[in-house]
Every structure is written in C-alpha cells, then in structure tokens.
Amino acid sequence: MRFDVITLFPEFLAQSAGLGVVGRAQEKGLFSLHGWNPRDYAEGNYRRVDDRPFGGGPGMVMLIEPLQACLQAIRDADPTPARVIHLSPQGAPLTQAKVRELAALPRMVLLCGRYEGIDERFLEANVDEEISLGDYVLSGGELGAAVIIDAVARLQDGALNDAESAAQDSFEGDLGLLDCPHYSQPAQHPLGDVPDVLRSGNHAAIAAWRRQQSLVRTAQRRPDLLDEQALGKADRTLLEQGRQVQKQKADP
C-alpha cells in the first residue's frame, strides 16, 4: 500500500504515521507514505498556492496550477494507478466498510484542502471521490488523511500482532456491531469486579456473553446500526436477555 498525500503540512502526516501500530506497520514495509507540498510546485518568489475567490467573499481558494503540477509529479514518481480522494465535509461519511474497500487498493492519493477550499475545476478534473469524517468543519484535510492512513494501515496483513484483533473491532463481523466491553487485571477492584463468565474458562459461554454485550451496546448507543428484524433467533434471545439484565441493574 502506498499513500501519497498532497498537503501544505507534510510533516504532520509523517509524525502521526510514525507512532504505535501504524508506525510499526510502516517499519515492516507494509505501507509507504509520501508527502507532497504544492508550494514546492508553485511559481514566483512567494510560492503562492492560493488567491481570492471570484465573486468575492471571505477566505482564499487553493490554485489549480500548483496542485496540478504536484499531482503530475506524484504520477511521474510511480506509474501505479491511484485513487484520488479529497478530504472534504461535502464527501460521503467514512465508514469501516469504506476503510476495508480502501485497504484493498494498491495506492491512493489523499488531497488535503486548506483555506476556503480548492478551485472546483481541479476537483472536477482529478478527484475520484470525496470522503468526510463527519458533519463538522476542520481547518484542513490533514486530520482526515491521518485517520484514513491509520484505519487502512492497521488492516494490512501483518500490521497487528493478532489478526483476530481487527476482526473483533467495532463495525466488523456479520452485523457490524459495536465491540463488547474488555477487562484486565486485577479481577477485583473497588470500581467493580470482572464478570464471572470471563474468568470461567468456558469459551462458548464467553463468546455468547461477548456477542450479547455487543448486541446490547449497539442497541443502546447506536440503534441506527442495528436492524433487529434481521437478527436470527439466537441473537434476538441474547439481546432480550441482555436487556433484562440491564433493566435489573437499573432497577434493583
């Protein structure tokens, strides 16, 4: 996997991608990250990459020419086809399903805008899709690019010490449920004890408990993700039993 990122702040992406799981994946050669600053491709003494918008209004707009030259340099550096993705609040929301789709690509170019945005002509001519982190506005696309790099890199084969870790994450699995609660040492603590079933050694019971917790947690916190009518009989039973337990805890 190769990431090429068009950004005015390539050092930001280099730093964030060098940490933790993603940093280790990069050290293993599971992906490569290349930052490209459009200012390096701007003309004139001031290396200007923005100008005022036609029609007036506040802010500045990123210019076509530096971006076009930057993108051409990326294509010249490696002939491998790349999907060009613009990080934008106008894009489709990023989901785990989209992350899995992107993880199967050999290469992508992440375009990070700044100021009021990018000249629409450049976007129409070069961008394959737009992706958003959510319904809010950031100062630029760099955080969105960092999120995509992190989410995609950890799905590369060998990125995680245990491949099952990714399979058990929130939004994965057959229903895309939220993850279940997790506990570690000590087993007993003033804040509460670890559920007995997790210490029982009964793997079938543990799996059923985790499934139940995922169902209940998804129904409570993200009901938009759960189509209860599509649940099988076993899952419906687990969900109802889990709800009863939650009700008993709330009304002892």
Swiss-Prot record:
EC number: 2.1.1.228
InterPro entries: Alpha/beta_knot_MTases, tRNA_m1G_MeTrfase_C_sf, tRNA_m1G_MeTrfase_TrmD, tRNA_m1G_MTases_N, tRNA_MeTrfase_TRMD/TRM10
Any one Gene Ontology BP term: tRNA N1-guanine methylation
Domain of life the protein comes from: Bacteria
Signal peptide: none
Subcellular locations according to the entry: Cytoplasm
Reaction(s) catalysed (UniProt annotation): guanosine(37) in tRNA + S-adenosyl-L-methionine = N(1)-methylguanosine(37) in tRNA + S-adenosyl-L-homocysteine + H(+)
UniProt keyword annotations, A-Z: Cytoplasm, Methyltransferase, S-adenosyl-L-methionine, Transferase, tRNA processing
Sequence positions that bind S-adenosyl-L-methionine: G113, L133, G134, D135, Y136, V137, L138
Function: Specifically methylates guanosine-37 in various tRNAs.
Subunit structure as annotated in this protein's UniProt entry: Homodimer.
UniProt similarity note: Belongs to the RNA methyltransferase TrmD family.
The protein's name in its UniProt record: tRNA (guanine-N(1)-)-methyltransferase
